[in-house]
């Protein structure tokens, strides 16, 4: 790959790798809680603490493919830097959700709601990128250049 291509995706790759490390951390928490309660074997049922860790991890895993899809779509189709920043914010919010879920369930609600908003923002960035592509394709007008012109004046 040439440097320009790598430069266009490096921030997205960094956020993706950080999310992989975070998933490993969550899985380690589940494994640790399972072994604490059940000895050496992994079982899906157990104490309330294990149920909370397992459910929090499962909820994070359920939203993960959607996060990756909108992160990369927004970064490739619209702009890499805001998409990567939103991705980092999502990872911080997901961490807050996970830790909050282990305590009182009401502590996880702000993280959950803000995480949904970040995914919506990334989705809207993706739609804007697709819209801009078709504006250029059909009308020869680049909306992104117009936005840059307006914001710099």
From Swiss-Prot:
GO biological process entries: leukotriene biosynthetic process
Membrane topology: Multi-pass membrane protein
Pfam families: MAPEG
UniProt key word Transmembrane: yes
Gene3D superfamilies named among the record's database cross-references: Membrane associated eicosanoid/glutathione metabolism-like domain (1.20.120.550)
Intramembrane segments: 108-115
SUPFAM superfamilies listed in its UniProt record: MAPEG domain-like
Membrane topology, Lumenal segments: 1-8, 78-80, 129-153
GO cellular component, as recorded: endoplasmic reticulum; endoplasmic reticulum membrane; nuclear envelope; nuclear membrane
Family: Belongs to the MAPEG family.
Reported function: Required for leukotriene biosynthesis by ALOX5 (5-lipoxygenase). Anchors ALOX5 to the membrane. Binds arachidonic acid, and could play an essential role in the transfer of arachidonic acid to ALOX5. Binds to MK-886, a compound that blocks the biosynthesis of leukotrienes.
The protein's assembly and partners: Homotrimer. Interacts with LTC4S and ALOX5.
Name this protein carries in UniProt: Arachidonate 5-lipoxygenase-activating protein
Native organism: Macaca mulatta (Rhesus macaque)
């Amino acid at each position: 790959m040439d440097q320009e291509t790598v430069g266009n995706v490096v921030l997205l790759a960094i956020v993706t790798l950080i999310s992989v490390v975070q998933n490993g951390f969550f899985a380690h928490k589940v494994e640790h809680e399972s072994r604490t309660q059940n000895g050496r074997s992994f079982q899906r049922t157990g104490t309330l603490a294990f149920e909370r860790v397992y459910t929090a991890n499962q909820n994070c895993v359920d939203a993960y493919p959607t996060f990756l899809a909108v992160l990369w779509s927004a970064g490739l189709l619209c702009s890499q830097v805001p998409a990567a920043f939103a991705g980092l914010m999502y990872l911080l919010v997901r961490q807050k959700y996970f830790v909050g879920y282990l305590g009182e369930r009401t502590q996880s609600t702000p993280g959950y709601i803000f995480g949904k908003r970040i995914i919506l923002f990334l989705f809207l960035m993706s739609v804007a990128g697709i819209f801009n592509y078709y504006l250029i394709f059909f009308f020869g007008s680049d909306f992104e250049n117009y936005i840059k012109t307006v914001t710099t004046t």
